[in-house]
Each structure stands twice: as C-alpha cells, then as structure tokens.
Amino acid sequence: METVRTTCPYCGVGCGVLARPDGGPVAGDAAHPASGGRLCSKGSALAETTGLADRLLHPEVNGRRASWDAALDTVAEGFRRALASHGPEGTALYVSGQLLTEDYYAANKLAKAALGTANIDSNSRLCMASAVAAHTRAFGEDLVPGIYEDLELADLVVLVGSNLAWCHPVLYQRLAAARAARPEMKLIVLDPRRTASCEGATLHLPLRPGSDVALFAALLVHLHDNGFADAAFLASRTEGLEPTLQAARAVAAEAPALTGLAPSLIQAFCSLFARHPKVVTLWSQGVNQSSAGTDKANALINCHLLTGRIGAPGMGPFSITGQPNAMGGREVGALSTMLAAHLRQDRPEDVALLRDYWRAPALPEKPVS
C-alpha cells in the first residue's frame, strides 16, 4: 500500500508521519530530522481521525452541499459586501499554526494585498507573541538561535515553564536518551508544579508563579559578579550592559522573597548554570502565556548574552512552539503586526518594499491599533 510522508499537526515538534490513504495505521518517519521515527500517543492515533463518517468531504453553504465554485462565490460575495459597507477594516482572517508555510503565505497575501487589511492573526498569537517580542527586542528580528540537536549536545538543559515530557514528548525522549548516553548531563526544571519533566532532574525549583524575572535577574548578577561574563562577546555583539545590570540588581536582592525559593536553592541554580558553558535554556507556554511573558524571555536571553553562550553547538536560549508551524507563520508574516520575510507592519520602509514587490497598492499602511 502506498504511504504518504506528512507531518503530525499537534505539538511544536512536528514529527514525521507515514500515512496511508486507506486510513490504515500510521507510522513514524525514520528519515525525519526532528523525530527520527518516533511518535507519541497522539501522533500514533492519527489514523483514527481519518475515518470518513464524520469528515466534511464537500463544501457546504448554510448546511447544504454546494460546489466549490458556488462556495467560493459565496465567500467572495461576503468579502465584497463587508468591503463595501465597512472598508478593509471590516474584514479579517484567523489562521492556525497547523497550516503549511505556503498556505500561510497565501492567506497573508489575500488579507493584506487583496483585501487591504492587517486584520489577520493566528492562534500563534496566544502561544508565541511574547517570544516574538522578546526575540525582536534582543536580536532585532524574530529568530530562534538554536536547533533540536543542541539539546543533545548541551551539558546542562534548563526547562522554564515547560512540561516537556507531556507537551513535547518526542523531544523529551531525545533529551532523555542524551542524558542516558551522557549521565553527567544536568537537567534543571523551573516550574511551580512538580511535573513529569522533573523525574530524574538534577534540580527542581518550584518558584512562585510570575517570578521568573526575579530569578533570572539573580542569575545575571551572579554570573557577572563571579567572572563569567564574556567581555569580548559583550563588546562586539551587545549593547546596554550597564543599565541591564542596574535593573537586575534592583530585583536580584529580593529574589528569595519574590520567588519563594530558599537562598540556597537559588545559589545552587546559579552555580550549576555558571559551571556549564554548554547550556540550553528551553522555554514554552508557561513563560509565553503570561502578563510578563516578554520580560521573562528577555531575562533568560540576557543570561546567555552576558556569557556569550549563544550561537554555538549545545548552547543558547531556545523557545519551543505550541504547534508545528508557528515559526512558519511568523516567517511569512501572518500576524497583524508583521509582513512577509520578517518585515514589520509598523515600518513604512518595510511596507513600501513589500507593496512594490507584491505590486499591491492596497497593502495597509499600519497594523491594527
């Protein structure tokens, strides 16, 4: 029976799947670079979603079957009425981190070039907007300075706001296999709860919810004051060290009270981080879905920038997404504040560049306010 190579649509790992058109059992794709043939329980059950009884096989309009032409005409007429009555701001698209990159690009172009509206957003807004803002604030662009292989090469992995064992199981399996092969590899978990990811961890810090910034401020000060700053990296690749340290010192002294952690536990965390140059700090929704999500992400990124532990194998700050193509949506600009290729909707020069490239005079001037 023919098999089709595809991707699991669930978590951010995006595992490779071998599926059969007849709805037979699925299998992991051993050639896939992220999963290497592994599937979790949800991925293994994908075939159960392909049964025909409950699937919509044809377009429907008002609950009745329609041809594709009739359905598309209905959608187009709806957009025409909205544009005539309310202008471009009367239209909107809501898309998903489960779309293919090409589909994401087409949807974004439909909204911004054809409809003339910046009213397109993705459910990635909920899971990744804080990381997007933190990356942009730290690096100037929304770029992730790490790959999955870094987890296997690191001497220390720090999980922040991530129950990797349950939420990204195949990636956790890769981490567990790496630790089994190198027992000296350390794992620290920062999470108010004791989750499955804490099993076998070197250290668990049950910090008070929302106190991550204080903990990483304490770490930043410890690294600087104990000689772990990379002076050459700081001079050539960064700016703003002194005001950052000043702000961190104002918080670091209160870290035990703010985090609810014993000073000895904070010291143990800082010491482990300092002693292991090859460190990956991996964060997910426990950081992002927060009123201070951007500040939390920047606080941990700053610790990597201070020490130069970024941009080399086995080290760096690493944001993992909630869905397999959240990054693809960001790359094609399918958010109300972004344009294709990491261009920004709030930069007139970026708008002009894309308007010329797309030949799209209707491209909106600014993001949704």
Range-by-range predicted roles:
Residues 1-226, 244, 262, 304, ...:
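N-terminal export/assembly segments and adjacent metallocofactor-ligating motifs
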Residues 57, 230-239, 260, 313-325:
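Short alpha-helical "patches" and their helix-cap loops
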Residues 84-88, 120, 184, 225-229, ...:
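Intrinsically disordered or highly flexible coil/loop and linker segments, enriched in small
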Residues 92-100, 257-261, 284-291, 323:
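Conserved short loop/turn motifs at secondary-structure junctions
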Residues 154, 226-263, 340-353, 357-362:
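N-terminal leader/propeptide and maturation segments of large enzyme subunits in energy/redox metabolism
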Residues 157, 200-201, 250-253, 283-287:
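Flexible glycine/proline-enriched surface loops and loop-helix/loop-strand junctions
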Residues 245-247, 266-279:
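Core structural elements
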Residues 274-369:
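A glycine-rich, hydrophobic/aromatic-adjacent loop/helix-cap motif
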